[in-house]
Amino acid sequence: QSALEEAFQTSSPRHKRNAVRAVFAFIDGCHNFVRSHVNSQASAYKHLYSLSDLAVLREESPYVDERGNVKTRQLKVPLITSIKALLKLLEKNNVAKHEVDLTHSGFFALAKAIEIRNRVVHPKNAKELDLSENDMQLVAQAFNWYLAFALRISYASNEALETLINSFKK
């Protein structure tokens, strides 16, 4: 969180932009971990999930090439859509209980923070590089919400895997 703290302690536009980039680098990396965690849980409970469900968790899309070979290509799912999909997929397993609230202001802040990140990373003009205090507050709120989300989902999928492992011990 030091990039965020540094951005709030200074009015430097460069520090603010670096903080936005750092937050989303963390979120992107963490989301890959969370998705793979849910994929492990889903793979252990395969009877609850369709092949499409498992493909989405692996971010793969099957296709047939011009020679008739079945192949897969990478599927890029936007972060907000991916979060919703992970929650729906976890809900298929009643053992993997979570308490994630998509009506929480932090989730809405995440959607706004993604717009801010996109504006900073792909500016259409120099003005789009300017970040207000409100922008930084939204990014901080998004970071906090995502961190709580990742911890809750990881815990839920861990619990589901632990329940399955314990069922084999009986």
Regions found by a protein language model. Give the residues of each.
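Charged alpha-helical initiation segments
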Residues: 1-21, 37-38, 145, 164-167
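Long amphipathic alpha-helical segments
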Residues: 40, 130, 151-170
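Hydrophobic alpha-helical packing segments in soluble, helical-rich domains
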Residues: 22-30
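Flexible secondary-structure boundary motifs
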Residues: 42-119, 123, 127, 145-155
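Short, solvent-exposed segments of well-ordered alpha helices
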Residues: 9-21, 104-111, 130-133
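Short secondary-structure subsegments characteristic of cysteine-rich extracellular domains
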Residues: 134-150
